[in-house]
């Protein structure tokens, strides 16, 4: 889990636009965040396996 202070800091608008970055909307993780969903790979996998994201399923071939 991310620190509450870091989540609050990331929510503020940065002084320069290049300093902005995405965070997971669920857990606050700063890395490997999918822009389409707004969540990180860990939360995406968990939610996809539980069937909470419509149209997304585990690949099998």
From Swiss-Prot:
The keyword RNA-binding applies. InterPro entries: Ribosomal_uS14, Ribosomal_uS14_bact, Ribosomal_uS14_CS, Ribosomal_uS14_sf. One of its GO terms (biological process) is translation. Binds 1 zinc ion per subunit. Zn(2+) binds at residues 24, 27, 40, 43. The keyword Zinc applies. GO terms for cellular component: cytoplasm; small ribosomal subunit. It comes from the Bacteria. One of its GO terms (molecular function) is zinc ion binding. Keywords: Metal-binding, Ribonucleoprotein, Ribosomal protein, RNA-binding, rRNA-binding, Zinc. Pfam families: Ribosomal_S14. Its cofactor is Zn(2+). Part of the 30S ribosomal subunit. Contacts proteins S3 and S10. Belongs to the universal ribosomal protein uS14 family. Zinc-binding uS14 subfamily. Binds 16S rRNA, required for the assembly of 30S particles and may also be responsible for determining the conformation of the 16S rRNA at the A site. This is Small ribosomal subunit protein uS14. It comes from Campylobacter fetus subsp. fetus (strain 82-40).
